[in-house]
């Protein structure tokens, strides 16, 4: 395979029409330039330039490969330019994965600020309903950074964003609204708006309930935490919902759990040294875990 240096020497010789002038333009000695041309000719199996009494000219082979040689050099320049642009934050691609319940409340404000500050960065977002699926996206190279609860297995770099609370969203006029907080015992006979079995929240909440000897009674299932909150607010049944899924405009009735049900939220970092990942993670950590107004308004 010819080197870029050999192609550069060929193009310089064709432009200058002289070994001497081409060597001077590239700041090479004439023997060094001739060595590069000889290596190129050995690779191809034919001469690329013809030595004349005064100067040189391209052979038929040299004329044939000249355009591709110039294109290869231009492509190499673009590679270097693109890399430098990313290194200075002027471009590139950032691939983010996020637990779907956290996209609107936690991640959206960070994305808005990030894209405004880095308009040349191509940002892709993949949502999942499982923390272990976030790990799969990182391990397979689909995502550079992932935001979600703690997975069952992760040995890479991570940063704790904060603690997220799970609250009970109640139908309008529900008897449990008379209480300042709700326990799992009080939900034993309540048909819950629960999550599909393949949703990470389903297994996690079942395990939390089991700690208090309670097996959730399922009235219906949904795949989205925000939908569970809306269904509960519409009177379908009680839902246990992460606060990040409520959104700033949520107006339903909610109560905190007793004792509090909480989980850590993390940035799982697949490429810690990436020049885009580092500042993005820093922005997410500065944002922290938002607490919607409805949670602030709930009885203490």
Regions found by a protein language model. Give the residues of each.
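Central regulatory/effector-binding core of bacterial HTH transcription factors
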Residues: 91-153
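Flexible hinge/capping segments at coil-to-helix
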Residues: 155-166, 170-192, 278
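A short LG(V/I)-centered, amphipathic sequence patch enriched
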Residues: 41-63
């Amino acid at each position: 395979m010819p080197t870029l240096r050999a192609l550069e020497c060929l193009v310089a010789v064709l432009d200058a029409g002289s070994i001497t002038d081409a060597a001077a333009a590239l700041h090479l000695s004439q023997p060094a330039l001739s060595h590069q041309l000889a290596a190129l000719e050995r690779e191809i199996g034919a001469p690329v330039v013809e030595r004349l009494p005064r100067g040189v000219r391209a052979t038929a082979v040299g004329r044939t490969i000249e355009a591709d040689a110039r294109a290869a050099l231009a492509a190499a320049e673009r590679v270097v330019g693109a890399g430098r642009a990313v290194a200075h934050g002027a471009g590139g691609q950032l691939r983010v994965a996020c637990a779907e319940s956290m996209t609107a409340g936690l991640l959206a404000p960070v994305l808005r600020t990030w894209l405004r500050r880095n308009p040349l960065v191509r940002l892709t977002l993949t949502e999942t309903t499982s923390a272990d699926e976030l790990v799969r996206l990182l391990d397979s190279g689909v995502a550079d950074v992932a935001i979600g609860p703690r997975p069952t297995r992760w040995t890479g770099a991570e940063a704790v964003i904060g603690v997220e609370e799970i609250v009970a969203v109640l139908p309008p006029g529900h008897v449990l609204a008379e209480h300042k907080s709700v326990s799992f015992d009080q939900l034993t006979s309540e048909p819950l708006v629960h999550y599909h079995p393949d949703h990470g929240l389903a297994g996690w909440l079942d395990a939390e309930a089991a700690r208090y000897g309670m097996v959730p009674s399922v009235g219906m299932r949904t795949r989205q935490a925000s939908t569970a909150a809306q269904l509960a607010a519409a009177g379908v049944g009680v839902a246990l919902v992460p606060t990040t899924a409520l959104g700033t405009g949520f107006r339903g009735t909610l109560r905190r759990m007793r004792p509090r049900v909480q989980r850590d939220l993390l940035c799982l970092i697949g490429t810690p040294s990436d020049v885009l990942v580092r500042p993005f993670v820093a922005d997410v950590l500065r944002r922290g875990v938002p607490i919607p107004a409805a949670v602030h308004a709930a009885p203490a």
